[in-house]
Amino acid sequence: MKKRRSVLALLLVAALTVVLGGCQDGKDGKADSSDTTSSQVSTESTPTGEPVMGGSITVGIPQDIEDSLDPHKSVAAGTKEILFNIYEGLVKPDEEGNLNDAVAESHSISEDGKVYTFKLRNGVKFHDGTTVTAEDVKYSIERCAGINGDGTPLVEAFSNVDKVEIPDESTIDIYLKEADTEFLAYLTVAIVPEHVEDLEADPVGTGPFHYVSRSPQENIVLEKFSDYWDTENQAYLDKVTFRIVKDSNAVVTNLKSGTLDM
């Protein structure tokens, strides 16, 4: 049951990414605040129904990020919702919860269900401009599994990982101790650059938004990543500010005044 809840959580955290990716700009370049629950694009300001590129929104969140900005150490759902816009895994869920290849271009699973092979997508960039390598992927998976560390997995689901091998510069083989039909969903876990020593201070991923700044108890700011690999699904927004508003009454007031868009 615990593993099933984990899988559902991995699929649900994509919801905010969908909202940010499909927001419609209003007249002032900000998102329309009249609909705070749906990612469906409004056609009122744009008769063709096509999303408008650019602009910014401010999203109200009930509390500051209380755990790590390191995606392998964060546990709170609110943190994951934000980090899911910064980081990507070998696969990622779409708006319907289907797992699609992301940093990986394709994948296959052995007949015994114990070996997962991924072909990496060519030219995927981290936010610092470096290119994702097989070594980065190997490092990320081994880090989650506690391999080459103190043996303690950073991500519990990866305790089943036996080893990770690189047959060639664009291929990764992940060997499991036991077959696990839910393991593919765990591979939404963030691929991070091996050369970044402190992801808490420098959150570097491959997602459609890159981290800009954080003011504790005030806000977290993300901006569009112009070199995002998925050219057909670029972020529409240029900037997203997550503003901490703990009082639910204040949220309503700010939405009405336009201080918050969502």
Please identify what each model-predicted range represents.
Residues V19-G22:
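C-terminal motif of bacterial Sec signal peptides marking the signal peptidase cleavage site
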Residues E105-D150, K256:
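Aromatic- and charge-enriched surface segment that lines or borders ligand/interaction sites
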Residues Q24-G26:
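Bacterial signal peptide processing site
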Residues M53-Q63, V115-F118, V137-S140, I172-I174, ...:
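Short, well-ordered beta-strand elements
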Residues P153-H195:
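Surface-exposed binding/hinge segments that line
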Residues V137, S170-I172, V251, K256-M262:
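Alpha-to-beta junction loops
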